[in-house]
């Protein structure tokens, strides 16, 4: 089953290579890597071009914000699931995707543990999550895989500058 990993970035020369290497070093083979750049001018594109043989699709053009870039990434994705591994983010090791997707999955959303500067972010254990949970904790993009069909059906609200992802999850 194909997984689409989408990186959105803008002027991320200091962190983009770590993200790219994290994605392309995954041992799971059916990965489509997409990079949506907002028109970087700092050398980010030189790094992207260095790895373009590993990238299924990349584009560099101005966008109207992060949610516009994320929606654009979903538009080009062909995988069953999408994950956003934005510039500066990385998988904890090279077996993350293999550990998740070796067995056939059919959940609409898969969320795992994420290491963040404050410690660890843990996904909810419940199948039915309350609205209160979203306002308190939310979901961590880097540790969440969402069926592409859902992302196409319910795109991020590009009029919002923050929290459009919260609205999506609700």
Where does each model-flagged region fall?
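N-proximal low-complexity "stem/linker" segments adjacent to membrane-targeting elements
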Residues: 1-25
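Acidic helix N-cap motif at the loop->helix transition within catalytic regions
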Residues: 14-17, 42-50
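Short beta-strand/loop segment that forms part of the nucleotide-sugar
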Residues: 30-39, 59-62
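A conserved acidic beta->alpha catalytic loop
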Residues: 37-46, 86
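Glycine-rich, basic loop-to-helix element that forms the pyrophosphate-binding segment
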Residues: 60-77
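Short aromatic/hydrophobic "clamp" motif used to bind/position activated sugar donors
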Residues: 82
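Conserved donor NDP-sugar-binding/catalytic core segment of glycosyltransferases
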Residues: 90, 94-124
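Conserved nucleotide-sugar donor-binding catalytic segment
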Residues: 112, 122-170
């Amino acid at each position: 089953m194909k997984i689409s990993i989408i990186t959105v970035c803008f002027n991320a020369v200091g962190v983009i290579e770590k993200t790219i290497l994290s994605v392309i070093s995954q041992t799971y083979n059916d990965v489509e890597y997409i990079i949506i750049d907002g028109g970087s001018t700092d050398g980010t594109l030189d790094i992207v071009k260095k790895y373009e043989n590993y990238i299924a699709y990349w584009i560099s053009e101005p966008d109207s914000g992060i949610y516009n870039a994320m929606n654009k990434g979903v538009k080009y994705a062909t995988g069953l699931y999408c994950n956003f591994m934005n510039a500066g983010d990385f998988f904890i090791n090279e077996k993350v995707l293999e550990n998740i997707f070796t067995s056939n999955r059919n959940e609409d959303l898969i969320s795992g543990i994420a290491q963040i500067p404050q410690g660890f972010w843990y996904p909810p254990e419940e199948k039915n999550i309350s609205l209160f949970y979203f306002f308190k904790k939310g979901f961590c993009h880097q540790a969440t895989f969402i069926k592409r069909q859902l992302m196409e059906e319910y795109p991020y609200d590009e009029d919002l500058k923050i929290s459009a992802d919260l609205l999506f999850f609700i």
